[in-house]
Amino acid sequence: MSQDVIGILSDSHGDLAAFDAAYELLRAKGAQRFLFLGGRYSDLDEWILDRRERSRGGREYSGADFIQDVSRWLSVADQKPRPRALSGGFPAVTTPEENPLLVRESFLRAPERDCLQYRDPAIPRKILDMVGDTLCCAVHDKNDLERDDLVNALIFFHGRESEPKRVQIGPRFFLSPGRLAGAAEQTCALLEREDRDLRFSAWRLDGKAVLEPQVLPLERKTKVSAK
């Protein structure tokens, strides 16, 4: 059984139906955490809001809805905070209707260059995190990668590709889930960890594999450069 299962999606550009289909597909495949690589940073928030509005069936937001939301916020506030991360034990993901806060917390996302969040110094433009003992870097545009990123990380997730890609350059892997909008096929991807093995695959939204699951032959490093 996989110890970490990470769903990866990118470039939805307002197509909330595709975002929704990708989330449900990846969740059905066991994803516990999600990487949204940009291509309209706010789509995550709008998708959660859209799901909740549709769950009310057109009914207006009521006092009971408000009380329920406050109760959810308070229950989260009472919990011991834990840092967001790609790897580790996490609660089973749910739907935005059941627990929108848990769903949002299960995502890490990177902003694209033409969004306001890209210029916000409080929001990192890249995600650097460990999956098992492998340092990974996630970014919307791979041109934003810097020398230290390339020296230190072994796996790079990036958006802005018309189709899923699994490219090896030396010991490093550049992985893209493809696009949810603006491409011939709407696709997303999955990274699974079993012990020290990492397996990458990509999928159409109808569940057909575009890139079959394949273990990445990684060469682990013994030290990290910090300059």
Locate predicted features.
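Core catalytic region of metal-dependent phosphoesterases/phosphodiesterases
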Residues: 1-132
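A signal for specific C-terminal beta-sheet/loop modules enriched in small/flexible residues
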Residues: 31, 147-161, 187, 212-227
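Metal-centered catalytic cores of metalloenzymes
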Residues: 6, 132, 147, 193, ...
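Conserved beta-sheet core of the metallophosphoesterase superfamily
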Residues: 85-86, 90, 95-97, 135-201
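Active-site metal-binding loops of divalent metal-dependent hydrolases
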Residues: 9-14, 38-42, 105-107, 140-143, ...
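Short, well-ordered secondary-structure micro-motifs
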Residues: 46-48, 113-117, 149, 168-169, ...
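A short C-terminal boundary segment appended to hydrolase-like catalytic domains
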Residues: 164-170, 197-227
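Flexible, glycine-rich phosphate/dinucleotide-binding loops
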Residues: 43, 183, 209
